[in-house]
């Protein structure tokens, strides 16, 4: 196909300015990872990334717009559900999240081996993951959770304690100044990690740019995606530097534009998006760089969300490693705006509303009134209120040491359930066109940590005829040694994989053992 062509398609005159095998919308961790997979699997494919901002990884992937937790379900209590009827703890989601993160680590280890990623410590470092609770009921839950998780080899090495001095040894900051009569408990997983997804994204894109078949266009705003009779897609773009309009014809489209994915998916007109809506929620964190405070805490400590609060509100006080510097952050504190992106438009929410999703979003609002009350309470919160919440995790806090930082926007999914009623769904979800040539990623956490599992899902949907070929299978096994296998329940494989990834990524290896 020539660079410029004029085609009469469905009675509309279209000026095709370029063509590609696949267009990736958004220059964040998802598109960068997808682009790297495709470059390895099909080096001759023409891959285009379009990003509306002047730099990549400036929205959810930016280091200041997420907490950097390598989500492995070691410390996040919302990945394990307590069943009041039989007093059991369901760990199925924790296992799924953990396996997904192990898959991401394998791919990163492979990229280190082939010199695509050169300095692992620039994007991943060991920071122990801890859960910390107080009160009789919460302590009971954490103990049951710990006992349930030990039934999986994936959580071998987790330690539980109710001893104040033991917990103080792990992280003095959360214990010093605390009432010694308070009932507390904690779990600790030494092999937890802190991940800089912004640095990882930048390194992937820097390597991709060496491929002559890869093109990245910054300050290019994708405004719509339209399908053609021949199963191709026209991606309509505005060059924000000169306001020129462009149209790119492509065989495949992936929309990895964070909060904007829903709006762009709606322009495609595919019926699969009918009924989907989005609910934007932002976040803020208290941050300190004071070395006297930072040195008292080397952990990501997750607590338990308050009653009626959503999963995304789980408070945590974290060590973060940014360009070699350690800082602490505490939060999140919810914010609300109608923007779907941090650098988005106030009209994003309103542009996403249509006849297919107005009813579902109203139903979800009625059914989640507790969430609305929670958001209101967060919006009227004063800085001293925030410090009071921090004091529950850091009893001797000095307010003058902490600064409030605004993080990124997340768009929670609203969709119809089996009863055709709109429900609020936390997490991430891939929406595909019927023929698999267009896919979009919607939702939020634990997205970035599970990026490679999501890409494998996309490959299976979009390139089903290729993923089962010997050529692709062999390459995928090279990239992900546990590909097609389950880690849970396989002690030998878990240790083999973890030893491999830890060696490559310069992380601490702890041998898993049978109970």
From Swiss-Prot:
Record SUPFAM superfamilies: FAD/NAD(P)-binding domain
Catalytic activity from the UniProt record: (S)-malate + a quinone = a quinol + oxaloacetate
Cofactor(s) this protein cannot do without: FAD
InterPro entries reported for this sequence: FAD/NAD-bd_sf, MQO
Enzyme class: oxidoreductase
One matching Pfam family: Mqo
Biological or metabolic pathway of the protein: Carbohydrate metabolism; tricarboxylic acid cycle; oxaloacetate from (S)-malate (quinone route): step 1/1
EC number: 1.1.5.4
One GO BP annotation of this record: tricarboxylic acid cycle
GO molecular function: 2-hydroxyglutarate dehydrogenase activity; L-malate dehydrogenase (quinone) activity
UniProt KW keywords: FAD, Flavoprotein, Oxidoreductase, Tricarboxylic acid cycle
NCBIfam families listed in its UniProt record: mal_quin_oxido, PRK05257.1-1, PRK05257.1-4, PRK05257.2-1, PRK05257.3-2, PRK13339.1
HAMAP family: MQO
Homology family: Belongs to the MQO family.
Name of the molecule in the record: Probable malate:quinone oxidoreductase
Organism of provenance: Blochmanniella pennsylvanica (strain BPEN)
Gene: mqo
């Amino acid at each position: 196909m020539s660079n410029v062509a004029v085609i009469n398609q469905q009675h509309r005159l279209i000026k095709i300015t370029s063509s590609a095998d696949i267009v990736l919308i958004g220059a964040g961790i998802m598109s960068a990872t997808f682009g790297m997979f495709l470059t390895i699997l099909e080096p001759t494919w023409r891959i285009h990334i379009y990003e509306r901002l002047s730099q990549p990884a400036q929205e959810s992937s930016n280091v200041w717009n997420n907490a950097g937790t390598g989500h492995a379900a070691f410390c996040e209590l919302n990945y394990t559900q307590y069943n009041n009827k039989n007093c059991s703890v369901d760990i199925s989601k924790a296992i799924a999240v953990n396996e997904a993160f192990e898959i991401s680590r394998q791919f990163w280890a492979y990229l280190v081996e082939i010199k695509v990623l050169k300095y692992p410590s620039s994007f991943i470092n060991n920071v122990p993951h801890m859960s910390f609770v107080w009160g009789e009921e919460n302590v009971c839950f954490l103990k049951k959770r710990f006992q349930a998780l030990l039934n999986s080899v994936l959580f071998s090495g987790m330690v539980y304690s109710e001893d104040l001095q033991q917990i103080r040894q792990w992280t003095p900051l959360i214990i010093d100044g605390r009432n010694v009569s308070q009932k507390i408990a904690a779990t600790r997983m030494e092999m937890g990690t802190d991940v800089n997804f912004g640095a990882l994204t930048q390194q992937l894109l820097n390597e991709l740019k060496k491929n002559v078949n890869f093109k990245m266009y910054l300050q290019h705003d994708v405004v719509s995606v339209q399908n053609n009779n021949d199963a191709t897609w026209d991606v309509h773009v505005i060059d924000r530097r000169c306001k020129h309009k462009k149209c790119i014809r492509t065989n495949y489209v992936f929309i990895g534009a964070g909060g904007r994915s829903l709006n762009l998916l709606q322009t495609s007109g595919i019926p699969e998006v009918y009924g989907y809506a989005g609910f934007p929620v932002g976040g803020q964190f208290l941050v300190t760089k004071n070395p006297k405070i930072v040195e008292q805490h080397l952990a990501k400590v997750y607590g338990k969300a308050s009653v009626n609060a959503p999963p995304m509100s789980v408070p945590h006080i974290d060590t973060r490693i940014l360009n070699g510097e350690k800082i602490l952050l505490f939060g999140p504190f919810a914010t609300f705006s109608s923007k779907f992106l941090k650098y988005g438009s106030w009209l994003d929410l309103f542009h996403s509303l249509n006849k297919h999703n107005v009813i579902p979003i109203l139903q979800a609002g009625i059914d989640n009134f507790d969430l609305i009350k929670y958001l209101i309470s967060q919006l009227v919160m004063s800085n001293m209120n925030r410090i009071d919440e921090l004091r529950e995790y850091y009893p001797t806090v000095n307010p003058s040491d902490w600064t409030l930082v605004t993080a990124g926007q997340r768009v929670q999914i609203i969709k119809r359930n089996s009863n055709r009623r709109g429900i609020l769904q936390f997490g991430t979800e891939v929406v595909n066109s019927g023929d698999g040539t267009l896919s979009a990623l919607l939702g939020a956490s634990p997205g970035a940590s599970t990026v490679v599992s999501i890409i494998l899902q996309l490959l299976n949907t979009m390139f089903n005829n290729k993923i089962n070929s010997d050529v692709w299978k062999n390459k995928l096994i090279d990239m992900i040694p546990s590909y097609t296998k389950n880690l849970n329940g396989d002690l030998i494989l878990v240790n083999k994989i973890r030893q491999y990834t830890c060696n490559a990524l310069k992380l601490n290896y702890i041998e898993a053992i049978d109970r």
